[in-house]
Amino acid sequence: MSLDPSSFPRSNSPASSDSSLTRSRLRGKEGSLKKDKNYRRYASSVERALSLFDNTLQEWADYISFLSRLLKALQTHPPDQPVVPHKVLVAKRLSQSMNPSLPSGVHQKALEVYTYIFNLIKPEGLSHDLPLYYPGIAPTLTFASLTVRPLFLSLVETYVCDLEPWAIRPALKAIILSLLPGLEEETSDDFDSTLRLLNTLREIASRMDTQRPGAETNSSGQYFWQCFFLASITSPSRRLGILAYLNRYLPKLGVTDRRPSRHEEVDATAMPLEMQVAVDSVILPEPGLLIRCFATGLTDEQVLVQRNFLDLLVTHLPLSSPILQTRITKDDLQRLIVAAAGVVSRRDMSLNRRLWAWLLGPDPVGDRASFEARPSISSTASKTAAESEELSQSQYFSRFGLQPLASGLLQLLKRDTELPSEKAKPFRITLSLMDRWEVGGHVVPAVFLPFMRSVKAYKLAAPKAHFDEVFRSATSFFDGVESGMIFSELLNLIDWDAKSLANDAPRILDNLNLAHFILDHFNVREEDMVLNHAPLLTLAALIKMSELSSEATTSVAHDQLQAVSNGLSKVVTLLTGLLIDRAFLRKSDSKNSVNEPSMLLDRPGSAILRQIHQFYDRSRNSLDLQPPPFPPTDLADLIIKNVYEQAISAVNACNDAKSIPERLNLLIVVLKKLPRSRILRDKRLYVAIGKHIQASTVELSTASFSHLSSMSTTITSLYCIHKLGYYITYEEVSDLIPPLVRQLWQFLSPLSPKFHVEAVRCLWNLHSVSWSDHLVESTITSLMFTPPAPGSYQLSSEEEAGRYFILWNHSHHGTYELPPKNLQDSAQSQASYHSSMLERPLFTVLDLLSQGSTQPAQVVQLWLQDLPSVAKVFRIIISKLEGVLHRGNQLGTFEGNTVVSPDDYAECNYLFETIHNVLGALNHNGWVSLLTQTMAHNSRRHDASASEDNAEAPSLHSVVFQASLKIVSGYKSGTATANAEEVKLQQISLLVMRQLLLGPGVEELVESGIDSLLVDRLYSMLDEGGDIAIQAALIDTLLAVLKARFSQAYLPPPPTKPKHQRGGSREKLTSPSLLSFTSDKPEKSSVLLPSPEPPQRLLDCLLKGLSSPRSRAIIDKWIMLLCEILPIYSTCIFQILLTLVDCLGREIRQSYTNLQSAFEKTEGWPKDRPEQTTISLLTGFETCIAAAHERLLMEEVNAPAAKSPDQTHGFFGNMVSGVFASDSNHPRSAAMNNRLTVLLSFQDAVRLCFSIWSWGAAERSSLPQDTESIASFQYTSLRMRNRSRRILEHLFTAEALECLETMVDMWIKSDRDTSPLIFNLLHTLDGSRPKIAIPAIFNAIYTRTNPAALDPSRKSTMTTALTETELAGFLVTYARSLDDDVLDEIWIDCTTFLRDVLSNPFPHRQILPRLVEFAAILGVKLENTNFGEDRRMRKELGDVILRLLTAIFTSKPMGFTQEQGLLGRASLDYDSSSIQRIGPDDMLSILVASMPAFSMTLGDMDRITTAVSNISTNIIGPFIRARLFPNNLNTSFMALMQHISKIPQVAKVWKKDVADAFNDPRFFGSQLDLVKGGWMTLLRQWALVDKDRLSEIMTRLTPPATAGIMFGVGASAARLDADRKAQLNLRRISLLVLSTAEDYFIAEMPALLQKLEDLLGATASSSPSSATRAEIFMVLRALILKSTTTTLSPFWPLINSELQEAISAISSGNQQELYNPYSLLQACKLLDTLLVLAPDDFQLLEWLYVTDTVDAIYPPEQFEPTALADEVSHNLGVRWSTSSDPTRESTNLHHGVRYPGLAADWIRETAKDEIVDRVLRPFFDQLSIHAFESTYSISNPNLEACRDDLLADLFNESTMAN
C-alpha cells in the first residue's frame, strides 16, 4: 500500500519539550524520578525515539520504524520503575499513529506498543492514565481491518475490563461507543467477542451501581443501561449495533402475549418480582433515557433501524406495559407514541404492520397461530371465556394509546416552526393512521377541530406559499375523514346552549367563524355530504338563527348578538349553497320518523335539534348505516318552514336594517333549491309585506332602500319560481307593485345620485312581471301628476320630472333583460317592452315644455339639451304621429285636409307642439342626432361609410320634415270657414318646418345700456336673495343681449376642419366664437379687432354667481354665461385669468368633496347636486384656460420674432417640429408674463383634474363605506374620471412639456399609493404617449443642463422647481413602466439624445449615471422585442453604454467622491416614487440594476470585458484601495461584485479585485452583514475559479523561529508584526473554509494540519509567538463546522491534546506565557461548538471534558468528577462576578434547538483581564449538567448560530496583535 509521505503531518516542536499539561493525575511519579540516573537515561532514550516522529517520517514504513524504536526504548525501563517518560507526548504520537489513512500494519504495531505500555504500567497505572491512552484507540473499530480488530478487542478485554470500576465509570459511555461498531454485522468473527465484552462491562457496571444510595445489590447494571441508552440517543451511526444488543439482552418490560382484560388494572407493583428487578435495572435512575432511546431510533433516517425499534416495542415494551402507563411522565409517553406514529410518513407497509401491532396489542388468543398441539375441549372453553374478557383492539388502543397520541399530535401542531413541511406533519400522520379504523376512529374526533383551528390561524400568520403547502396536507386529511364525523363536529360548532350566549359570546363567535372557514375552504360537496348531511346541518343552523331573534336573547348585549347573528348568517349562506333538490326527492327509508308531517312541523326547534344530535351520536357509536332522522320531503318542509317563519318575523319586526334583506334573500334561495312546498299557501308573507309597504313612510336611508329592494326582488322571484303564480298569484303581485313603485320612486331624487342605479333596476324588475298590464308605467304616471293649486293648471312638478329623467337615463345606460320567455307576447318586440314603461310618463314630462318660461319647462329643456338618447324621444313621438297619419290614409279625404281626420286634429296638434317644444330645446349634439339617427333602433347614418341599406332609411330629421310637409301640403285653401284646430295645426306644422330649415337664428341687436342694467339686477339678487327662476331668466336675457351686442366683434373666419371630424366634448357649452383646444398656431394674417367695453360689474357679478350657494340649482346657466362672455374679455384675459381659475378651482374642490361624502355616509349626506355641479364647473374651468391659451397663441404669432444667431444642429435642432410649437420664438417681457400666467393656470388644472381622476381608481380600492350604493358609486366616479381625463387630454395637447413637468413635480411629492396612478394616467392619455412624453423629458432636462444649445421653441419656461437629477430619476422610472412594444416609437429619439449628450457630456455630468440606467432599460426592452433582432441597433446601444461609462469616469472620477460617503446612501429603490430615495450619483446601485442588461446588450465578449475592466479600474479598485476601506462598502458594492462574478469570461478581472480586498490587512474590519450576504458568496466563487487559494495562503504561514532579534528595541515590534501576519492568514483560512462547500479543501487538509502543528510549537518569545493560538482554535472551529467525519479524523489527536492543555491552564494560572485570556476564550468556544454539534468522534472524547453520563444529574455517593470542566469549575470556585450569568441565557434550548453558550455579543466586548471571571467561570459552572440536559432534550444543533459566532470572532479586529 503506497502512501504519499507528505500527507502525514509531523510536529516540529522538539521532542524533549515536556508537555504543559499540568494535571497531577497525568503526571504520575515523573517529578520524583528525575533525580534518578537510571530514569534519566531511560527517559533520554524515549525522547530520542520520539524525535524520529518529527524528522524522519516520509512514508508508512517510517511509522513502523518509529514505533519499533519507541517500543525498544520503552523496553529499556529499569525493573523498579514501571513508568512511561514523556507519557503525554507518547500518547499523542501513538494516537497519531492510529490515523485511519495509515495501513493496518502501522495500526498493528501501534497496538503492540499500547499493549506493552498497559502491561508495563499495570492496572493501577492504567486506572490513572486511562484518559491519556484510551482516546487514541477508541475509534479503532470504525476503520480497523480484520487483522487489527481482534488485537483491539483483546487489548480492551485484557487491560481495560480489568480496571477498577471507579476508573471505568467516567469512560463507560465512550467505551460502549467504541465497541458498538463490532456488533453491526452479526455474521462477523468479532461479533461474539464484542458481545462478550459488553456483557462484561454490564457486569462491571452492576458493581458500580452498589455505590449509589438506595441501590439494590442485584440491580443488574443500571448504570450500564443508562450509558447504553445515552449512546443510542447521541450516536445514530451506531444504532445497528445497539439494536443487536437490545434484541438479545433487553428485559421484557410488560406482558406481550395477550391483551389485558376489561377489569384488569395496570399496576407496576402487580408485576412478578423478577420482572420488577429487570425493569428497575433498565429505567432507574432516569426512565426518560429508555423512552428517548426508542424515540430517536423510531425517527432514524434508516428504515431498517426504525423497523427493528418497532419490533422491540412489540416484543419488549407493549403499549399496555405498566412502565409506559405508570412509571414515566405523560410527556415522555407522548414523545414515544408520536415518534412511533411518525413512521407512517415512510409509506412502508412493513413499518405500518409493526406499528398497528404495537398500537392495537397482541392478536386475540383464537387468532394467533400456535405451534402446539390442538387444545382440548375444556381448555378451548376456558380460552373462549378469557377471550370474552380480553379488551378488543379498539378498546386496547382507546385505553392505553388514544390520549397520549392525540395529545402528542396536538403538541406537534402547536410547535412554533417556520417550515411548512413540519407544520403539515401532524396532518399527514393522522391521515395515515386513518388506514385502521380502530386507531383513526378514535384519534380523528379528538384532533379534528384543533387541526382545523390550526389551519385557520396559520392562514393569518404565514406567507401564502407556506399556507398553500400546509393546506394541501390539511385538505388530504379532511377528505379522508368520514362525512358524518365532519358534520357532527360542524353541528357542535354552530349549536350552543342558549344560557351561555350572554356569557360566552366570543367563544360562540369563534366557533361560527371556524365553521365558516371549514365550509368555505374544504371540499364539502361529496355526494354523501350534500344528500344526507348538508340538509340536516342547514336545518340546525336555521333553528339557531330563529333562536337569536327570540325573546330569550334580550339579556345579550346588542353588539354581541349582532356579531353572532352575522357569523351564523355567513354559515347559513354557505350551507344553502350545498342544497340540491335531489336530496329531498328520494324515497324515505327512515324508521323512526314522526308519522304525521304536520306533527313534525309543529315540533319545537330544540326537539328537532335533539333528534339531529341523537342521529349523529348513533352514527358515531355504530358501524352500521343509521336511518336519517327525518324523511326527505319532511326535511324540505322543515327547512322551508323555518326560513318562511323567520322571513315573516323580520318583515313584521323591521327593527334591524339587515334582517329583512337577509331573511327574504335566504327564503328565495331556499325555495329555488328545494322542491315545491305548500308551506307558503297561508299567504302570511304576502300579507306581512303588504302591511309593511302600506304602513311605512318613505325614509331616504340605506336601511329603507335595502328593505324595498329585497321586497321587490322577493315578489318577482316568488311569482316566477317553479311555475308562474305557484307561490304568489298575479293578482297578489298586482296589489303589491303600485305601493312598491311609489316608494322606490322617492329614491330617484335628483338631489343626490345615491341609489339611482339600484332603484331603476328594481323598477325594471317589477316591470318584467307586469309589463303586459303597464302597472309600473301607470303608477309612475300617476305619481307625476300632482293636484293643481287653486286657480292654476299644473301637469307635473319639477321634482317629479327630475326623477323621470333619472329613470330614463339609467334605463338607457343599463342593460335590462327582457322578461322570461313565458311572460313574452310573441307579437310584441323589445322596443314595445321598453316603451311600455317609459312612454306615457315621457309625454307627461314633455308637456311641461308647453308652459313656456316656467321653471319646470326649463328643467326639461336642459335635460333634452344634454340627452345622448334624444333620438329615442323622437322615435316615440314620431311613432305616435305616424299612427295618426296612417289612420288618415286609411279613412280617405276629409273636408279641409286630405291627410288627417278632424277627429285626430287635437292629437296631431299635440304631437306637433311637442316636437316643436323638443326642437326648441335641442343643442348642437341634439341636432346632430336628429340628422344622423333613423327610426330603426341602434342604427346611425354615416355620411361616407354607411351601407346602401342604411343610406336608404330616412333620418329622424327627414321623417319629421316630411310629416310636417304632408300636413302643410294637404291643406285645402278654398274652404269657407277655417276650423280653429286646423289653423292651429297648420301654424304649428309651419313652425316646426321653419325650425328644421333655419336652425338656431341670431338675435337682433338690442339697445346699448340694457346689459349693465341686467348685470346690476343680477348682482343685487345675489346679494339680497331671490327666486332661482328669476336668476335663470336674467341670465338668459343677459346672454341674448351680449350675444347680439358683441357677435360681430369677435367672430373670426370659420376654421377649416376635416370633413367628418366630430365636435369636441366642450363645444356644446361654448360659443362658436371660441377657438378649439389645439396647439396649432393660427395664421399670422388673422387680425385682432378691438372689442367694445364690457359692462363694469359683469366680472364681479359672474364671480359672485359662481361662488354663491344660491346659484347651485342653475349652475349650468352661470357656466354658460361664463363661456359666452369670455371673448368679450379677450384683450384683458390675462389680468382676470388667475382670479377666475382660483374661484372655479375652489368651488370645484368644495363640490367634489360633497360628492365624495355622499357615498361615504349612510345618512345625512349632502344634497346640493354635487355631481352636476362638479361637471358644470369643470366645463367652465376648461373653457377659461382654453380661451386664455388661444389668446396667448394669437399674440405670440403676431409678435415680432427675434432672430436666433446660432442654431444647434443635432437632436434638438432636427427633431420633428410641431410637437411643442406652442412656445413663441423669442417673447417679449409682457408676453413672458402672460405665458407665465397661463402656465400657472395649467398647473392648477393638471393638479385638480388628477385628484378627481384618481378618486375612483381601482388601484386605490377606495370603495364607499355604504356598499348598498356601490353601483351608483361606480357610475358616478367613472363619469368624473372620464370628464377630468378629457380635460387633461386637452391640456397635454396644448402644453405637453409644461403639463408633464407638473406631473413630474407631483410624482416627486407623492406617496407610494399615488405614484403608480401618475404613470397610469400618463399611459392613458393620448397627449402624453411615449412618442411625445420622452422627447418632452429630454427638452426639460436640456433646458436645465445646457439651455444655450437648445432650440428656443423647445425650452421649458421652468415654472416648476425641478432639477435635472429629479427629471432624470423620473425618466428612468417612466421608461421602466413602458411596454416593451413602444421601443420602436422612441428608439430614434432616445439614441439621438444619448449621442447628443455624449458629444458634450460635461454639462450633464450630474445625470450621466442615470442615463446609464436609462440605456440599460432600453437594452432590456430591446431583448424582449422583435425590434431588437437587428444587430445594428444592439451594437449602437452597446457603443452608447461604453461611451457613457467612459464619460462618467472621465468627468467624475469615483476615487474623488466615494470617500465622502457617496455610497452611504440607501441603494436604489425601483418602486419608490420619492426622488430623495434615488441617489442620482449612486453609481453602484445603478450598475447593480443595469449589469444584467449590460451582458445582453453589449453582446460581444470584448465589449463586456472592456466594460467590466472600466468598472473594476474606476469603481471597484478605488473603493478597495480607499483610505476608508472596508467601511466604505455597502450592499450595492457587494451586489455589483456578485453580478460581475457570474460572468465567466471576465474572471481574470474580478479575481484580482477579490484577491486585493481579501489580502488587505483591513479586510477583517468589514461589516458582518456584508460578509454573510456578499463576501462569503464571492469567496466561494473565487475558490471555485482559483483552486490554489488555500495553498497559497498556507505558504505565508512560517514556523515559529527563536533566532534573530531576541532583545533590543526592534524585537517586540518584529514579533508583533509576525504575530499579526500569522493571525490574518489564519483568519483568512478560517473564512475560506467557512465560505466553501463541505470538504472542499480535502486535498489541503494534511498540509494544513502540519502548519497548525508547527504554529502550536510557538512560545511567548518566538516569532510568531503563542498569541496566534486563538486563531488556531478558530481554524479548528471552521473545520468542525465544514468537514465530514473522515476528513476530520486526523485532527482529533491535535484537538484533544491542545484543548486539554488550554482548559487546564484556565485554573492553574501558570500558562499565561502560552495562553492569553483570548486564547483561553477561543479554546472554550471550540469546546462549546463540539458540545453543540457532538460529532461522532468527539463523543469518544467527551467524557474527558464533561461528565457525559447520568452521573451529571444523579451522582453516586462520594462522587468525584474527573471531567476537565468539573475540575476547572471546582478550582475556579462558584463565586460570581458582579454581573449576572448572561452566558447561560443563550445556552437555554430554544424550541428544541441547541445554541452555543458563548455566542453573546457582550462576550466579545469584555475586557481582557475580566474574561476568566465574567465569562469562563459562569460557563464552566454546571457545564456537565447543561450538556446532559441538551442531550436529554433530543435537541438539534443550530449550525447557523455557531457559524455566525465564528464570523463575529473572525471580524473582531480588537483581538489581533496591534
Curated annotation (Swiss-Prot):
Membrane topology: Peripheral membrane protein
Region (Transactivation): 1838-1854
Keyword Membrane attributed: yes
Localization terms from the record: Golgi apparatus membrane
Compositionally biased residues, Low complexity: 1-23
A Pfam entry, by short name: Dopey_N
Assigned keywords, A-Z: Golgi apparatus, Membrane, Protein transport, Repeat, Transport
InterPro entries: ARM-type_fold, DOP1, DOP1_C, DOP1_N, TPR_DOP1_M
Biased composition (Polar residues): 1070-1079
The keyword Transport belongs to this UniProt entry's keyword annotation: yes
Family: Belongs to the DOP1 family.
Protein known as: Protein dop1
Gene that encodes it: dop1
